């Protein structure tokens, strides 16, 4: 029987809660010649899911259901005649579905996409080299967006990072920073990666691959990093400062920590000046300040407020590192589809130590 019920977690605007809605889908007619249909087995949540919900203002012409989530892992169940033969029925795939307020999201049973447009897709490879308790779909749903974000910071700003490079990571305990240190060490062979985190997270982050760790809870942050800089690092400044949590401590003293702009050094942020607060409006004066800084041509340093492109490169690399046993995505918790609200509450708590994954359909 070609007709199925497609469940999805949706919302109308920021005054309506997330809820499960259903729609009949004809699997023989729902896709174009250039599209594939993926049965999603697992998806994961990201802060952007909460942010776009909070920004969905109630408007008279905007009453259609909108969907959650971008990361997915599943199986191709249908493929159009013009789809590249690389993508076949029964292939297991993982990806990051790019959308803002779209009719489709990955927190649903089925996803229809054109892989030549939605390029952030790769095949799921063998995961047996990893010491993990998670099935391949749950494991793979946890990495596309965070890995792609880390990859973009390291590769897309014209820097030539390598053994002589030094990177400072603000927020070493995040999933993005975890991915970044793995790429920096296993792919780029970056000589020195310094992480900032709580003193309680030192052991965990040292095992992740950071060369040095600086506590944010034992004194003024710039002073603590400064001690490492003038001591162990012999006053050699950083090629890249990557902020994955939202911080503004270094802007007044940037020249003391970041190499000159002429050497193509960069300060890259994915969160702006302050840590996300899911109980407040996501766009405020601090957001405006970050946007102004990114657009200001008179800065004395290179600054980027990163957005994630839809690219194949980071998907292929992430899948390869997982297959090689060199990268195991961090997972905080796994929820069943019906418990989506508990999963969202966990994300909003800011206490998750890794990705929050939602299982949608069982592995076959």
From Swiss-Prot:
Recorded GO CC terms: lipid droplet; mitochondrion
Pfam families found in the cross-reference section: ADH_N, ADH_zinc_N_2
Localization (cell): Lipid droplet; Mitochondrion
TM region positions: none
Annotated SMART domains: PKS_ER
UniProt xrefs under SUPFAM superfamilies: GroES-like, NAD(P)-binding Rossmann-fold domains
InterPro entries: ADH-like_N, GroES-like_sf, NAD(P)-bd_dom_sf, PKS_ER, YIM1/Zinc_Alcohol_DH_Fams
Keyword tags: Lipid droplet, Mitochondrion
GO molecular function, one term: oxidoreductase activity
UniProt record similarity statement: Belongs to the YIM1 family.
PANTHER family according to UniProt: ALCOHOL DEHYDROGENASE RELATED, RETICULON-4-INTERACTING PROTEIN 1, MITOCHONDRIAL
Name of the featured protein: Protein YIM1
Protein's gene: YIM1
